[in-house]
């Protein structure tokens, strides 16, 4: 009937009018929140109380960075013997705090696991003339302070670097490797040219804009400061459907419940910060366009070369196929730039663990509660396992704990983590650049250098003469991203009546029926808008890629800027170090001399490594069993245990036959002690379930070496004390 059609329409119109009022009231709240947030001395979005430890502005080379100690919330107990965690937030246009944005965050899961937590944040404006190197030196002081504050800790601090902070931490670890425990880099680009055709076009933007001269121009227009709002806008441009429609529509369609989450995120997203012009110029020239980090082409002010092969701490790389800002290739291809094979990685004493999420976006890597509880939670709980892994390349795999999981009490949480051995071919299989692509990006880098020189010679003096501090400040205030907050705040008289009207709407709120046909039509209309914007994005990305490949693939242009069009080698390959080879040979000779030494403890570790060699994976249950055994037999410090595991691994790698032959001479004469040692190996190896035929074969060989042809006795898992857990509410 006509009335039957009219009723849903009226219901929908009333709801739409009410939603519109509530939507604009949230926009008003967002604008007010933006102004209040920026008025603070240290604006941040940390969900925790914290106490200042070091103010970077007081250092010899002052910077705008701060180190704070995070206060654990009620109900969370910190174990002083556990290594501290240091979370470093990205300074990429937004303010600090996203690493501790909520309870299910990197900080939250680390404290829940019992670790003391520190946070490295920053102020909105840089100290005049501060550089990237100054920040690195300040962060070194921060880590020294953290280490000194925890003399009882089982290991050096675990440092987490999100996005931009990841490559900054890697640079510092290359300069000061002795400071670090395990390093976790989340969504951090380290190989800036890497990618595959048809995806991730952000890497082409530097070449299509003619290089970094625009960066220099932006710094000059800011009177020596670079407005971080431009970086935020660059992020938003990667997903126009979300920027122009989905984010706002999601709020509108869920207006009765979505406002707190929306405002919480917008508080961080709109907290724009500035960088010095010199800082952003370094980042663009040396990293994003030059791709010089992994190639070892960056030098400090005193001439020291930044070589990522100097890093001695385990490196955990967390990336995602759904991340269009830092795709897996940009997060991992630095390994290909540095090494020829896994033996090269081992020769440098490096342990590299990576995990690739199938779908999460860039921000989700360090914002998503689900990711925090799963990946970051497992990393926090198993950080000592990662720290003890023998050198090599591994992929972290997470399996859901079920009723069929063997020895579930040995794995904390809802997941079981194992680290599976990988080769460089596994990284190559993700796809990447060929030599033609390498030449294109090298050409773009040379064009950038030329254009930057031209700008500095002919335009920069004029721009600097025209722009003073008040003009630069005015231009920052009228940036479109800032205006969208300012315009819809209470500063705008037109918004004065919105709050009162919204209160009336809440008192008389009427939602439509769930089966209202117009609501379903609205959803379909929204889907069509998203599809249209996604189509526009895909078309523009395809055009961008084709333009870049055509322009910088020109042999004429390549030759003109000094790039050999017929080059047959990668243009950003890190050089070999002859001194490293010499030191390696000395280390091998030293290890060979230690083959018959170490006694019972070394023999047990050697036998365990040999017995599990063919598994190509290390399971957290096996490590937890080893930890319980270690505590039950004198609690060998984790640093000593790590050194022993690495030494025995290298000894087996160098000369397995001699290493095994030496085991009988390392054991005591009494059979009972040898049986106990053998049973410890069997417990650790059996922690993940039944032994395979190969496991049993190797265990028989170990039994023979231990003088136990019958295979030793059986010690039950329950006889070993369980790991003490930190309490959490």
Question: Where on the chain are the PLM-derived regions?
Answer:
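Short, surface-exposed "cap/lid" segments of acyl-processing enzymes
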Residues: 39-126
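Alpha/beta-hydrolase-fold enzymes
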Residues: 1-26, 148, 152, 169-278, ...
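Small-residue-enriched hydrophobic alpha-helices in membranes
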Residues: 564-729
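Alpha/beta-hydrolase-fold serine-hydrolase catalytic core, especially in secreted/extracellular enzymes
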Residues: 1-4, 123, 288, 292-306, ...
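Alpha/beta-hydrolase active-site loop
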Residues: 130-148
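Gly/Ala-rich beta-loop-alpha elbow adjacent to hydrolase catalytic centers
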Residues: 160-169
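Short beta-strand/loop motif that positions the catalytic acidic residue
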Residues: 311, 317-319, 323
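Short beta-strand immediately N-terminal to the catalytic nucleophile in serine-hydrolase-like folds
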Residues: 159-161, 186, 318
């Amino acid at each position: 009937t006509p009335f039957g059609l009219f009723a849903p329409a009226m219901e929908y119109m009333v709801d739409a009018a009410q939603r519109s009022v509530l939507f604009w009231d949230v926009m008003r709240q967002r604008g007010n929140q933006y102004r209040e947030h920026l008025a603070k001395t240290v604006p941040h979005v940390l969900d925790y109380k914290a106490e200042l430890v070091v103010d970077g502005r007081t250092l010899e080379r002052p910077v705008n960075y701060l180190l704070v100690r995070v206060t654990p919330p009620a109900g969370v107990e910190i174990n002083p013997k556990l290594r501290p965690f240091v979370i470093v937030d990205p300074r990429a246009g937004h303010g600090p705090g996203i690493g501790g944005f909520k309870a299910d965050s990197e900080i939250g899961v680390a404290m829940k696991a019992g670790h003391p937590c520190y946070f490295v944040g920053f102020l909105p404006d840089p100290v005049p003339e501060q550089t990237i190197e100054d920040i690195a030196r300040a962060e070194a002081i921060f880590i020294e302070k953290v280490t000194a504050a925890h003399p009882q800790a089982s290991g050096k601090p675990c440092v987490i670097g999100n996005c931009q902070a990841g490559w900054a931490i890697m640079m510092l670890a290359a300069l000061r490797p002795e400071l670090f425990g395990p390093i976790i880099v989340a969504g951090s680009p380290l190989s800036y040219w890497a990618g595959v055709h048809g995806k991730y076009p952000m890497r082409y933007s530097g070449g299509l804009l003619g290089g970094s001269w625009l960066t220099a121009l932006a710094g000059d227009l800011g009177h020596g400061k670079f407005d971080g709002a431009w970086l935020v806008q660059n992020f938003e441009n990667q997903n126009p459907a979300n920027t122009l429609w989905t984010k706002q529509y999601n709020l509108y369609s869920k207006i009765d419940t979505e406002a707190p989450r929306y405002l919480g995120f917008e508080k961080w997203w709109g907290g724009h910060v500035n960088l010095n012009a010199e800082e952003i110029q370094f980042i663009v020239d040396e990293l994003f366009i030059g791709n010089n980090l992994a190639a070892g082409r960056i030098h400090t002010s005193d001439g020291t070369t930044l070589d990522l092969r100097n890093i001695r701490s385990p490196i955990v790389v967390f990336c995602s196929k759904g991340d269009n800002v830092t795709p897996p290739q940009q997060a991992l291809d630095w390994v290909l730039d540095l090494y020829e094979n896994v033996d090269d990685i081992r020769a440098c004493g490096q342990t590299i663990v990576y995990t690739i999420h199938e779908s999460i976006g860039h921000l989700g890597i360090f914002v998503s509660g689900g990711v925090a509880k799963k990946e970051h939670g497992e990393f926090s709980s198993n950080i000592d396992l990662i720290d003890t892994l023998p050198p090599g390349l591994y992929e972290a795999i997470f399996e859901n704990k079920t009723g069929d999981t063997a020895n579930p009490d040995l794995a904390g949480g809802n997941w079981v983590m194992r680290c599976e051995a990988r080769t460089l071919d596994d990284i190559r299989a993700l796809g990447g650049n060929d030599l033609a692509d390498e030449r294109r990006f090298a050409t773009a880098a040379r064009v950038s250098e030329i254009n930057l020189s031209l700008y500095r010679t002919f335009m920069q003096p004029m721009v600097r003469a025209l722009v003073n501090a008040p003009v630069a400040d005015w231009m920052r205030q009228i940036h479109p991203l800032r205006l969208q907050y300012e315009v819809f705040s209470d500063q705008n008289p037109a918004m004065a009546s919105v709050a009162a009207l919204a209160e009336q709407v809440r008192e008389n709120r009427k939602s439509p029926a769930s089966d209202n046909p117009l609501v379903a039509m609205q959803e379909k209309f929204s889907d069509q808008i998203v599809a249209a914007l996604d189509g526009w994005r895909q078309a523009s990305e395809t055009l961008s890629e084709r333009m870049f490949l055509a322009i910088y693939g020109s042999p004429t242009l390549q030759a003109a800027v000094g790039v050999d069009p017929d080059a047959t080698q990668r243009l950003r390959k890190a050089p070999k170090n002859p001194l490293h080879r010499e030191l390696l040979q000395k280390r091998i000779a030293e290890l060979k001399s230690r083959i018959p030494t170490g006694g019972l403890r070394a023999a047990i570790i050697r036998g365990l490594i040999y017995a599990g060699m063919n598994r190509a994976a290390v399971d957290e249950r096996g490590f937890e069993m080893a930890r319980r055994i270690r505590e039950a037999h004198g609690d060998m410090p984790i640093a000593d245990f790590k050194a022993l595991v690495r030494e025995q691994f290298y000894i087996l790698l160098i000369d397995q036959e001699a290493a095994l032959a030496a085991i009988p001479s390392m054991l005591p004469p009494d059979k009972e002690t040898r049986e106990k040692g053998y049973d410890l190996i069997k417990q650790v190896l059996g922690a993940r379930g039944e032994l395979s035929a190969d496991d049993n074969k190797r265990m028989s060989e170990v039994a023979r070496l231990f003088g136990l042809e019958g295979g030793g006795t059986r010690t039950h898992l329950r006889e070993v004390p369980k790991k003490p857990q930190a309490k959490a509410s």
